[in-house]
Amino acid sequence: VRGTRTILLLLALGLVSAASLPADLRAALAEHDLGKRSKLALDNAGSALKAAREAYQKDDNPALAAAALEIEESVSLAWDSLESTGKNPRKSPRWFKQAEIETRNLLKKLDSLQHDFGFEDRPVLDKAKARLQKVHDDLLTGLMEGKSK
């Protein structure tokens, strides 16, 4: 909720233009169905991961940093959207399980990409990887334990 509200608040105040958000992330924000929004955001994270790989191969550090930030923002939007549904992941697992599987796959791909990097370049993805791991763990915990009442 916090990340989505922050983005929406910054957009409303005009501090961040909608043009500064990646096009796919804007499309995800425009989606009213929160479950679908989380899926679109995770799809965008996958696209950003591919962009990060391409940027690294081209030795384009600014594009790599932007892609890492986009991964982090996309994953946060997905998590915030699922949290905003107010649903218990254990009782209504559809979007939560789908997100858990997708974050697990993204983690594997991100880890593989990070291992392909030279040792000195690896910290670029640390923040995105940590956020992705946290969201995955929270999703898994929600599915296994359910929400506290």
Give the predicted meaning of each segment.
Residues 19-149:
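Long, charged/polar, soluble alpha-helical segments
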